Amino acid sequence: MPLPDTFSESVRIAVIGGTGISALEAEGFTAVASLDIQTPYGAPGSPLTILKTPQNTPIAFLSRHGLHHELTPTEIPNRANIAALRSIGVRSIIAFSAVGSLQEHIRPRDFVVPSQIIDRTKGLRASTFFEGGLVGHVGFADPFDSELSKVVFDIGSDGVLNGEGVKMHKDALLICMEGPQFSTRAESNLYRSWGGDVINMSALPEAKLAKEAEIAYVMVCMSTDYDCWKTNEAAVTVETVMGNMHANGANAKHLAAAILKELAKEEHQDLVGAKHLEGLSKWACCTAPAGRKAEVVKKIEFMLPGYFS
C-alpha cells in the first residue's frame, strides 16, 4: 500500500544515505509518508521518506544517489536535496558516506567522524544558493558541526558498532574528490602527504549547502578500502567497496538508530534545532536590498522565507 504523500508535522532531523544505504530500515522505525518535493533547484535525488522512530520522533531519509544508485557524485542534485529538507523543517543532518582510508590505522569497516575537509572537486557542481543577484559569504572554517559530531562519536564509541576490531575515529581530515573514477596512486600519496585521513566523492558541496541553509551537519564516513596508496594491497575496485559496504550497512543502521535515540533527549533540542546557526545566511548577505533580483530571492526564500525580501 503506497505511503501518504503529505505530512503535517515539522521534521527537524534528516538522515542522508550514500553508497550501500538506500533506505533506513532499523528496528522500531515506521515509514509514515513519502514526499515528492519540487524545489526551485529541481527535484531531490529521491523522495523524502518520513519515518517515526521508537521515540516517536519524525525524521526524513533521503537517498543521495537515488533509489537505485543511478546518480554519479557529480550528478547529485545537492541544492535540491538540501532545499527540500530545509523546506520541511530540517535543522540537523546525519549524512553517511562510503570512504577510502588514507591511513593505516583506519581500517576497512571502521567508521570515521571528520572535522575538516579539502575540496578536490572540479567546479562541476553547483555549490551555493547565493547567485545571480544575491551575494553572500557564509563562513566555512568548521565544515562539520562540532557539537553534533561529538554526539555521533560518543554514541559510536559506546559499543554500537559490531565486528572484531571495528573502531570509531574522530577529528579526521576528509578529502572530497570529483570522481566517479578512483584516485591514481600519485594522487592518493599526495593526499596522504597533506595529512588526509579518508577520501570520498560526496561531502561537497553537500556540507557547504547545509551550512548556507543553517543546518547542523555531520558526516559519518564508513571505510571500505585503503584507496590505492597501499602497494601491498590490491588496487581499489567496485567489488571491494561493495563487499565492505554491505558489512558496513548493518552497522550504519544500528548507529543511526542509536544517534536518533540520543538526539530525542531534551538536553539536545537546541542542537537539533540548530539554534546556534540561526541568521547565519541572513547576515552573510552583502547585496543591498535595492540590488537583489526578485527571482533569485524567491528561489532562496523557498527554504529561508522572509530572509532577503
Curated annotation (Swiss-Prot):
Catalytic activity of the protein: S-methyl-5'-thioadenosine + phosphate = 5-(methylsulfanyl)-alpha-D-ribose 1-phosphate + adenine
Glycosyltransferase found in the keyword field: yes
Binding site for substrate: M201, D225, Y226, D227
UniProt record similarity statement: Belongs to the PNP/MTAP phosphorylase family. MTAP subfamily.
Assigned EC number: 2.4.2.28
CDD domains, per the entry: MTAP_SsMTAPII_like_MTIP
Subcellular location: Cytoplasm; Nucleus
Record's keyword terms, sorted: Cytoplasm, Glycosyltransferase, Nucleus, Purine salvage, Transferase
Protein role: Catalyzes the reversible phosphorylation of S-methyl-5'-thioadenosine (MTA) to adenine and 5-methylthioribose-1-phosphate. Involved in the breakdown of MTA, a major by-product of polyamine biosynthesis. Responsible for the first step in the methionine salvage pathway after MTA has been generated from S-adenosylmethionine. Has broad substrate specificity with 6-aminopurine nucleosides as preferred substrates.
Residues with site note (Important for substrate specificity): S183, V238
Domain of life: Eukaryota
Annotated protein name in UniProt: S-methyl-5'-thioadenosine phosphorylase
Entry binding sites for phosphate: T19, R64, H65, S97, A98, S202
Gene3D superfamilies hit by this protein: Nucleoside phosphorylase domain
